[in-house]
Amino acid sequence: MYTMTVAPGADVSGGFYSLKAAFAAMPEDPAVPVTIRVMPGIYHEKLSLTRPNVTIEGAGASPSDTVISFGDYGYEIMPDGIKRGTFRSYTFFVHAADVTLRNLTIENTAGDSKTHGQAIALYAECDRFVAEYCRILGHQDTLFTGPLP
């Protein structure tokens, strides 16, 4: 097993300042289980996890102590002039097998769906996925489990 630590500002010896940085440094061998321990704080990140066999756990006393937050939304106009759309509005996209999220809050802060459209907090298109003691927050289409039709 390979264990990593993420803390705001990387104030933990040998740790990472963001989940994206930790994802990039994971062992390439998918057979090696990885546990990422996330220290309390708010992480403003849009995440995509494609490596299997990963556990991400908040190190706080409750899920509200460790928050992964982003604010993309479906009606947002992209640089190419096209709306972002529902399925690109996620805060956290999991596209890998054998993933566990534990003791975390994952939120999409886009706001009112009448003006912003759909805004997915967690998009899980995977096998053997577990979200344990997690808070998943948003205003519309908060959780999406794929695949797309």
Identify what each model region corresponds to.
Residues 8-12, 54-117:
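Right-handed parallel beta-helix/beta-spiral solenoid domain characteristic of secreted/periplasmic
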Residues 26-29, 108:
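Generic recognition of well-structured, leucine-rich alpha-helical segments
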Residues 10-23, 30-55, 59-66:
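N-terminal extracellular ligand-recognition/capping segment immediately after the signal peptide
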Residues 3, 33-35, 40, 46, ...:
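Detector for repetitive beta-architecture
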Residues 92-149:
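Right-handed parallel beta-helix
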Residues 1-8:
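Short aromatic-glycine-(Arg/Gly/Cys) micro-motifs in beta-strand/loop hairpins
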